[in-house]
Amino acid sequence: MKKIGLLFLLIGTFFSCQKKEDSYLEDPYKGKLKVTYVEEAKGWVKNIALHNEDLYFIRQDPFIGKIDSKGNTSSVTVTKSDNFNFNNDGSSVALSDSGDVYYTKGLLGPHKIFKYTPSTQQTTEIEVNYTPSYFGGREGILALTRYNSNEFMFFDFYSKTIKRYFHNLGTIVDVMGSGRDEISDGTGINASFRGIFQMAVFGKDIYVIDGKNSIRKIEPEGTSFKVTTLLKNYPETINDLAIDDDGVIYVVAHNQGILKFNPTTNKLEDYLSGKYIELKTPKSGLGYIDVDFDVDVISIKGKDMYLAFSTTLIKIANFKEEIAKYLLERERK
């Protein structure tokens, strides 16, 4: 009788284990956030930019790297053009249609834009003329961002102005900014800024983080641009923002994961947060990656989301679908 009982116990255990294994084989990502890749940048990531299916990242040491759409990092070095450390707020990277890499060195960097041409492996410097503000001092060129195929936008911290760089023509012109160190709305030179560290473009509109805790919208108005403050004096540091194809604004703030901006209430709402997020990639086999989800940088292209925190780079393909699945499973636990 004891032998029969033991036999049923073993059979039950077998089918229980088999059921768990079958459940895993049916959906190996169950309860985990499915991501395309999790890659180490081997240095602190300060900013990212997308070109075609490739992710470019600017590191602090100095280094600009590239990861392809599948997470291959076998050839990541783009340039080590000088020994200047990028460990500054506002250091940025952007690309032209031809694949030329433009970058700036942030708040404490020189008053220049740098251009790296992969075909020649040469770096050239573009001088930005000084226009002292009322609070001139720090030189930095911040938040260089591709505006369209012909031009970039950036923030000149020294003059407290936003400028346009027409890279095909080699000309730089002022867009807006009074030069005063304050947050005030208006058009052209009637608007004022404290310090723009990140920009994101949606159509012809630009969304910026000003003073590290305010979100502002810049939109064309006639021959000039108008700025409107959407969110002011958020209690935590806002690290970055991105806009999806539907115009939804996603924000990453210190220790708060990913937030969404609600235009009806003008408030940030939780989207994906948590002290630890369990990530699973096609490479991770039976295991998963448990990460401290304090995001520094975010970018969106089409249905894909790209994140960076500390030295880690992440791509989430079909991010809305995958995050919705993950949140539903998390609620059921």
Task: Describe each PLM feature range.
Residues 54-57, 100-103, 151-154, 205-208, ...:
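Conserved beta-propeller blade signature
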Residues 38-62:
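Beta-strand-rich domains and repeat architectures in extracellular enzymes and scaffolds
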Residues 59-61, 105-108, 156-158, 210-212, ...:
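Short loop/turn segments immediately following the C-termini of beta-strands
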Residues 28-44, 70-91, 106, 120-141, ...:
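Gly/Pro-rich loop segments of beta-rich domains
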Residues 1-42, 52:
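Bacterial Sec-dependent N-terminal signal peptides
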Residues 65-68, 114-116, 155, 164-167, ...:
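Hydrophobic/aromatic beta-strand positions that recur at structurally equivalent sites within the blades
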Residues 50-53, 95-98, 146-149, 201-204, ...:
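Residue-level detector of Asp-centered blade-edge/turn motifs that repeat once per structural unit
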Residues 35, 55, 62-64, 111-113, ...:
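Hydrophobic beta-strand positions in blades of beta-propellers and related beta-sheet-rich domains
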